């Protein structure tokens, strides 16, 4: 799977999860599948370059990126490394893109085929970036740590975010730039 869109992240992440699950029973199959997926994922990660802009907009950033960060977490948990995927050029910088796409209306700045509705429960994918960077800008505390009665229905991978929230340790607090531009397949300026 070597396409350059979010389906790459979804499929290769799933193949890695399945391979980890069967590794004790069939280590050769697991190893070859993981290698193939590790070779394929960079094709999708290239789309974040050079500055973190995701060409399909913020909604698809959330969809594809959550599968990347879950995959990175699985690899770290199983092998002690994510094999460099989390440090792929412009991947970590893409968290700033996501934050900058939050419009004053409370929705997302809408471009490409991106929807504009934000989850009221906070951005669990940004929690991974907060845990890795220590930057409070990516920890949506007021949206992530609400009372259970206000949370409502969780999304498919929100449970993984509890680990990242537990791992978060504030080491820095950056602020939003007054001007930002990002290049790539769908350049933008904010």
Where do the PLM segments sit?
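Active-site lining segments of carbohydrate-active enzymes
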Residues: 1-57, 163-179
């Amino acid at each position: 799977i070597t396409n350059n869109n979010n389906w790459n992240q979804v499929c290769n992440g799933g193949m890695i999860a399945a391979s980890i699950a069967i590794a004790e029973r069939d280590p050769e199959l697991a190893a070859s599948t993981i290698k193939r997926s590790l070779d394929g994922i960079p094709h999708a990660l290239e789309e974040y370059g050079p500055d973190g802009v995701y060409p399909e907009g913020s909604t698809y950033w959330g969809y594809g990126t959550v599968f990347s960060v879950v995959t990175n977490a699985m690899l770290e948990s199983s092998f002690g490394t994510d094999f460099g995927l989390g440090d792929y050029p412009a991947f970590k910088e893409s968290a700033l893109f996501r934050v900058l796409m939050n419009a004053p209306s409370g929705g997302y700045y809408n471009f490409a085929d991106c929807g504009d509705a934000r989850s009221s429960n906070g951005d669990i994918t940004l929690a991974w970036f907060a845990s890795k960077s220590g930057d409070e800008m990516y920890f949506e505390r007021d949206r992530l740590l609400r009372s259970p009665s206000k949370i409502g229905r969780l999304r498919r991978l929100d449970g993984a975010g509890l680990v990242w929230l537990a791992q978060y340790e504030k080491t820095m607090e950056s602020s939003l730039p007054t001007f930002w531009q990002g290049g790539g397949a769908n350049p933008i300026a904010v």
